[in-house]
């Protein structure tokens, strides 16, 4: 005879979520994960992701376990076989494909053999044009995918990333004790067109007008050298870049954020921070679902033509409210 605990486990089903992508992509699915969790109560939720997000997603309250996809080339048959074995082991009854890529489409068709698969291609309603669908913002597309998969969408449009934060008081107190503005003046090395070139000029204006505010940044490992050229405090933890959870805690503790269109900008938006993100021609704030009631975007055709004074005019009222 089965005891209660054994019965409970016997009745549970395993659910798989797939999400690779950039830091901003991971941040944005917080509401999606929460909605899936609330729909799949009583079932065990796994997420398949890349190794750099394992520590982060291991603390996410909406998933139970994290699986690693090394995303090796598809001609690496030994790796594909190993991945197939890993997935088969858990006998997943449902997949939510949040990556919606050619790679995950390949997994669905040739590798995982799981019939109940939610992706944009499998859930798009008859008569809906894919090109029109793709004009929606990132979060709107997720909302449609979830609704067409019988998931109640209460949180998808308003992701809350606060679960990622850890306390960073000991780190920050080594640098200063007053309120601070956080800047993110860099971007991925491959996306330098996203970088606004006048952060030092903006810093000079802010320090002149608001001497009560400190200005800080948190460079990633490949930004530490470039950060020496910026007139702001570089926050590290024992001379190492902050991890994602520490960075989330630092953003949460800040009074205002100014950023290029990067992962930390998405973190700031979905941690409920006041801030401004700067956009050039590469995309629109609506397309990437970054604006909130507090976190706003300033878009221009060419970031090189956006002056420091223009940016300051957009944020000065908010800075004046910081005691």
Question: Where are the regions that the model predicts?
Answer:
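Catalytic machinery of carbohydrate-active enzymes
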Residues: 1-323
């Amino acid at each position: 005879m089965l005891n209660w605990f054994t019965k409970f486990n016997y009745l549970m089903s395993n659910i798989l979520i797939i999400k690779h992508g950039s830091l901003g992509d991971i941040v944005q699915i917080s509401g999606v994960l929460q909605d899936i969790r609330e729909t799949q109560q009583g079932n065990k939720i796994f997420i398949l992701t890349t190794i750099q997000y394992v520590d982060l997603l291991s603390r996410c309250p909406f998933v139970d376990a994290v699986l690693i996809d090394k995303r090796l080339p598809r001609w690496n048959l030994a790796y594909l076989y190993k991945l197939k074995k890993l997935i088969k082991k858990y006998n997943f009854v449902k997949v939510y494909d949040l990556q919606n890529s050619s790679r995950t489409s390949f997994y669905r068709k040739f590798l995982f053999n799981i019939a109940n698969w939610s992706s944009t291609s499998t859930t798009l309603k008859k008569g809906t044009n894919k090109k029109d669908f793709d004009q929606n913002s990132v979060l709107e597309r997720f909302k449609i995918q979830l609704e067409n998969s019988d998931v109640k969408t209460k949180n998808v449009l308003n992701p809350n990333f606060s679960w990622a934060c850890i306390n960073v008081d000991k780190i920050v107190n080594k640098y200063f004790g007053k309120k601070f503005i956080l800047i993110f003046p860099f971007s991925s090395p491959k996306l330098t067109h996203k970088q606004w070139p006048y952060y030092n000029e903006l810093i000079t204006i802010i320090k002149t007008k608001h001497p009560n505010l400190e200005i800080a940044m948190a460079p990633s490992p490949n930004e530490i050298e470039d950060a020496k050229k910026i007139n702001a405090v570089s926050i590290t933890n024992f001379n190492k870049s902050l991890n994602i959870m520490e960075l989330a805690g630092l953003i949460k503790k800040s009074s205002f954020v100014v950023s290029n269109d990067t992962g930390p900008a998405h973190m700031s938006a979905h941690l409920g921070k006041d801030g401004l993100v700067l956009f050039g021609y590469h995309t629109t704030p609506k397309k990437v679902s970054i604006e909130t009631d507090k976190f706003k975007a300033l878009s221009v055709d060419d970031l090189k033509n956006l002056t420091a004074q223009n940016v300051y005019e957009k944020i000065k009222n908010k800075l004046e409210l910081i005691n």
